[in-house]
Design a protein with these regions (language model features):
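N-terminal nucleic-acid engagement/recognition segments and initiation subdomains in replication
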Residues: 1-71
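Interdomain "pre-motor" coupling segment immediately N-terminal to P-loop NTPase/helicase cores
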Residues: 55-112
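Walker A/P-loop nucleotide-binding motif
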Residues: 146-167
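Walker B catalytic acidic pair
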Residues: 215-216
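Loop/turn-to-beta-strand initiation segments
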Residues: 179-180, 207-210, 240-246
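N-terminal pre-Walker A segment at the start of P-loop NTPase domains
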Residues: 111-146
Length: 295
């Protein structure tokens, strides 16, 4: 097989086209800047002609938004053992899309609207009164100091934004701290459990990085749910100091009464054991406001 040099010596027309192509490529400002930055010798430049050509051709496609083999990647020149090479790096736009996708994946929603993944902490959370603003600052403080701060037990009336601010917190933790949060509607979670899948789900939920048990106290309580599900989840999270949040229509004292009520009798001490773990994991906060669900 003939070398390029032999072919060029036999075909003046090819040589002329080649020289013209090289001259065109070498006029490219990015190629010139690369040669200057890397102080390339004449020999290195000559050995890089084909790569310079590839770069100029692919760069033109990229800048003119033509179809490329690797969408979302832009060609850049690099040095590779004495000659220029072309590599393809992620564009800022693709990197932003990938990060946005990663942020969404880090927020897991179970039994709640998926739209909660798009609630913005600073743009969407209501702070209409001092009480709401105080809660906002507590949650903001948790985010800023993550993972050192204790979780919160937020209770109050229906529709005042308890779940809303927890979703906003999860999204902000994902974007600001790269942290993963699971928001779990506790009554739905409990209603979907049975003896066959309970062990799997308890092991999954108890280990998540940040956990929000939403609407706790609204579930149908029984001894199995309280002692084999909730207690096991909270015990693990207490031992591992994993951030845990709760929302409820009940305050802590009312939740204890709810947990003590079973079909058999009032089981005060098992309920107290669970509440000791709740109190270890979270500080009680009363949220006040108007019901916004029907606005």
């Amino acid at each position: 097989m003939e070398s390029i040099g032999e072919l060029l010596s036999k075909r003046p027309d090819v040589r002329g086209n080649f020289d013209k192509l090289v001259a065109e490529v070498m006029k490219n400002e990015q190629v010139q800047a690369f040669i200057s930055e890397n102080q390339m010798t004449e020999d290195e430049i000559q050995r890089s002609y084909s790569k310079f050509y590839e770069f100029v051709k692919e760069r033109k496609k990229f800048e003119e938004h033509e179809k490329m083999a690797a969408e979302g990647y832009e060609p850049v020149l690099t040095m590779n053992h004495g000659y220029a090479d072309v590599s393809y790096q992620t564009t800022a736009e693709l990197a932003a899309r990938q990060e946005a996708s990663s942020q969404l994946r880090r927020v897991k929603i179970i039994g709640l609207p998926k739209e909660m993944k798009h609630i913005d902490f600073y743009g969407d959370v209501f702070t209409d009164n001092q009480n709401q603003f105080d809660l906002f600052r507590k949650v903001e403080n948790f985010i800023d100091n993550f993972p050192q701060e204790k979780g919160l037990y937020i209770y109050g009336d229906f529709g005042i934004g308890k779940s809303f601010i927890m979703a906003a917190m999860a999204n902000e933790l994902s974007s600001k701290k790269g942290a993963s949060t699971t928001l779990l509607h506790y009554p739905t979670f409990i209603s979907d459990l049975d003896f066959d899948n309970a062990k799997y789900w308890v092991n999954e939920i108890k280990k998540v990085e940040v956990l929000v048990l939403d609407d706790i106290g609204a579930e149908m309580n029984n001894a199995w749910v309280r002692d084999s599900i909730l207690q096991v989840i909270l015990q693990h999270r207490m031992q591992e100091n994993l951030p845990t949040f709760f929302t409820s229509n009940l305050n802590m004292a009312e939740l204890e009464l709810h947990l003590a009520e079973t079909k058999k009798t009032d089981e005060i001490w098992p309920a107290k054991r669970v509440m000791e773990r709740v109190k270890y994991l979270a500080s009680e906060v009363h949220l006040e406001g108007v019901n916004r669900r029907h606005e």
